[in-house]
């Protein structure tokens, strides 16, 4: 039988050899089982330390007995002395195995183990003559047999697809990928601590609902067999959370999955994670303070700096961030002064077209003209953290109108590198106004706009009981993780992104 025991992890098995390599490993497993050493019958191995613990505390631990476990990533030598690299969740450490310091059978069995096998090692901490921090093995136990060889590494577009489809292999082979998900996890943990510290209460709201509301998006539809009704996967958590503000909870937030039946690109996945929060007795300014506090605090705690490299730019998260109205930033970038013709649809549309904005397929209103000019000409120029405020009412059906300029709303979106990172309102709490806006959205939906809001009469009824002045904020966990990790694709921060099934 051919032997791949000494194959270094840096050797890439050729496609034509894969069948043979799989057969070899299955044959090895069969021999183990026949000898009564089936690794899959083992249920426990007591680990005393992780590899990074040993490295961080080496001076204090030298000579100390330890038990470590992990995956074999390389093997070197096979005479009386062998070396291997063991990888656990914290990193790698060298294992030093010497025949005359181990049970002879144990050492001979170890020689037959393969790259990718999972082992438990008992030994003592020491440094080799070359100065390598290591564990001197006294006993090595095979805990799980790897029946499929590990690849060398991932590279190129084709291999990037494999990374997303086989994340389990990506995490084994690429420390930077695992680091991305550690940063994401740390960000969510920081977020919860931050909001809990402000007196917010974490809640859970329905994922399935008879009405899809709270955002302009196309929902996924499913069917509830017992009740024989169609239901929607939620496109936002907003309307349920605001019901809780009506109920008197005052400060609530939810970190949860959102589902939108829309296109996919480097910034969008149909299944993604958001945080939405609502606070009674505050407004848009309070929501700006919270989002800025979350992102600056997370960067400082997780990365140790306010400066991050993202999408080719050096992003400075140092407080305080720029705050500017949509009309002002449009004027600054394009020269188009929409406030000079506020409320005049014809002049607004003419102004938008004069700076090259495409208004086809968009209702010709002043507010839409302003928004389309911002969307098409300005958004991509917003590199450093910037709050854009005072959105047109046409694109903000759930935000409170400006008391001095009713064509505009007390809403902001925050942008970094041209990406929308957060969306917040001084929440609309007038049930009569809300009902009229729902009617306008329903009319759009009746005319074929599948992303327009549905009428939600129960939500209007909740507002009729009275909702205090409230600030609301929603932001994507995935995009925040992208920024903190410095990645250019949302798939790099979602463990199992949506992928088109392979033909076979």
Segments from the language model and where they lie:
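Short acidic-glycine loop/turn motifs at beta-strand connectors
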Residues: 89, 129, 333, 416-418
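Metal-assisted phosphate- and nucleotidyl-transfer catalytic regions
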Residues: 213-219, 297-416, 440-467
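TRNA-recognition modules of translation machinery and tRNA-sensing kinases, especially anticodon-binding
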Residues: 115, 121, 233-238, 245-259, ...
